[in-house]
Amino acid sequence: MSSSVLSPATTTGLSPRRKSLVLAICCISMIVVVMDISIVNVALPAMGRDLHASESGLQWTVDAYSLVLAGFLVLSGSTADRVGRRRVFQIGLAAFGLGSLLCGLAPGIGWLIAARVLQAVGGTMLNPVSLAIVANTFTDAAERARAIGVFGSISGLALALGPILGGGLVDAFGWRSVFWINIPIVAVAIVCAALFVPESRAARARRFDPVGQALMVVVLGSVVYAIIESTSLGWTSPVIIGLFVVAALGVAGILVYEPRRADPLLELRLFRSVPFSSAIVMALFALCGFGAFLFVTTQYLQDVRGLAPVTAGLCLLPVGLPVLVISPLTGRLVGARGPLLPLVVAGTALALGGAMSLWIGPATPLVAVVSIYLLFGIFLGAVNPPITNSAISGMPRSMAGLAGSLASTGRQAGTTLGVAISGTIIGPALAHGGTTFTNAAHGVWWTVAALGAGIALLGVASTGPWATRTAARTADS
């Protein structure tokens, strides 16, 4: 994003009620965007049967969405700075609604994946813009931290409740209904945005960086395609090796080219701030772990245990319910005490959840299974507010939108990698089911446990005095 969001006059002129309405509208947009990352997971088995899709086709159904979000969030944010945030916000809602309609009408997996791309294009116009509006509407530091905490909590809640809502919809109305439900929500949000969200533009919008944008898409696309298709082509395939080489060259290009631009797509100097750079890595770790958990769990519950979609969704209640309680408390705790404790709790819960999932087998009592899922709920409830706060709080207001966009990019990249990696690990075992599937999933659970440990360690490393000083130096530079 860029230099200014809401002008001081506009911001200070908003009443507390108007600010609350703006926050609510932004949260509604995040609910549909984030929920569509997870709500689709519980519908995957039904989609696969109805559309005769392969495991890689199902992976792309999830990853086409999160990959586009990861690749174009920053571009959409800077575009909103130039042409107006409310305008881009409303266009994004309309594109998301149209994509949802087309997903619901899909006659085949190719159509569905293409419609998911359109959905994601709309989503890229909602995520960074809504966060920038929230961050700049609430100017008082404590008030801002609470608002960002609510915003982050809503994101986590939507991610957790997606499979539960999706299970009920699939059971009652079929898998297409998980897309159609977005349409009335989007329509209400478009009207409310027109009525209550003030239009704003940046005083100096960041210029479009086509080379940086292309390099980012090349890196993300090459890595994800290589991971997903490695199951069929093999890791030693010239195609797979070539894709990783292309990704490495893309990273080198970013490191060489971006620092030379006045308005780079990726503001690499922000990464000198330890809290900020740690927040990006933790966002990637968190959603990589949770994306892998959801992808494996929904298929385990339905394809291995034979549960109906609604029952599978209800088994994930222990993931969603803690978010309702923990996220608001975490937001207040971050505002009052900082992000250290929530990050350590979140990382520890994810690590324990991954480690304990190693004992899940085809006949493990469901009570024991859902008890383990509770750990993932604790993790999700605690992780989002401190990550969002760490990414933004140390930055000047002029960089808040860009910092938030990069944090969101880390989340979406994490989801994409989590689905790609977990699908590659369990894909060959899915047709066999039973013990073959649960044994193959051990690789996923070890990965999830390691990611949780990484979040806890980074939480400690990024909140000390030295880390805080690096954030202050970056903000002043």
Language-model features: where?
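Helix-loop-helix hairpins in multi-pass membrane proteins, especially solute transporters
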Residues: 78-211, 363, 397
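Helix-to-loop junctions at the C-terminal end of transmembrane segments
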Residues: 73-85, 170, 325-339
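12-transmembrane solute porter fold
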Residues: 20-42, 55, 238-250, 259-470, ...
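Interfacial helix-cap and linker-helix signal at transmembrane-aqueous boundaries
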Residues: 47-48, 79-80, 165-173, 227, ...
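Central cavity-lining transmembrane alpha-helices of secondary-active solute carriers
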Residues: 63-77, 127-132, 317-330
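Intrinsic disorder in cytosolic terminal tails and internal cytosolic loops
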Residues: 1-18, 202, 462-477
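C-terminal membrane-cytosol helix-exit motif in multi-pass small-molecule transporters
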Residues: 3, 183-202, 217-229, 246-261, ...
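Extracellular/periplasmic helix-loop-helix junction of adjacent transmembrane segments
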Residues: 43-72, 111-113, 305, 310-315
